[in-house]
């Protein structure tokens, strides 16, 4: 079974980008709360 690399990359980006964005927002919020 051949793996569709483009589909794999697209899925990885679709998962990682929102996760990274939320993680950055969380870190910024935590840093502000630690003040």
Swiss-Prot record:
Location of this chain's protein in the cell: Plastid, Chloroplast thylakoid membrane
Stored SUPFAM superfamilies: Photosystem II reaction center protein M, PsbM
A biological-process GO annotation: photosynthesis, light reaction
Transmembrane annotation, as ranges: 5-25
Highest taxon listed in the record's lineage: Eukaryota
Pfam families, A to Z: PsbM (PF05151)
One GO CC term on file: photosystem II
Entry-linked InterPro entries: PSII_PsbM, PSII_PsbM_sf
Membrane topology of the entry: Single-pass membrane protein
Keywords assigned: Chloroplast, Membrane, Photosynthesis, Photosystem II, Plastid, Reaction center, Thylakoid, Transmembrane, Transmembrane helix
The protein's assembly and partners: PSII is composed of 1 copy each of membrane proteins PsbA, PsbB, PsbC, PsbD, PsbE, PsbF, PsbH, PsbI, PsbJ, PsbK, PsbL, PsbM, PsbT, PsbX, PsbY, PsbZ, Psb30/Ycf12, at least 3 peripheral proteins of the oxygen-evolving complex and a large number of cofactors. It forms dimeric complexes.
Function as written in the Swiss-Prot or TrEMBL entry: One of the components of the core complex of photosystem II (PSII). PSII is a light-driven water:plastoquinone oxidoreductase that uses light energy to abstract electrons from H(2)O, generating O(2) and a proton gradient subsequently used for ATP formation. It consists of a core antenna complex that captures photons, and an electron transfer chain that converts photonic excitation into a charge separation. This subunit is found at the monomer-monomer interface.
NCBIfam families: PS_II_psbM
Family, per entry: Belongs to the PsbM family.
Protein name as catalogued: Photosystem II reaction center protein M
Organism encoding this protein: Adiantum capillus-veneris (Maidenhair fern)
């Amino acid at each position: 079974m051949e793996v569709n690399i483009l589909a794999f990359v697209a899925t990885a980006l679709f998962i990682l980008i929102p996760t990274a964005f939320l993680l950055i927002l969380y870190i910024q919020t935590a840093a502000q709360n630690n003040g």
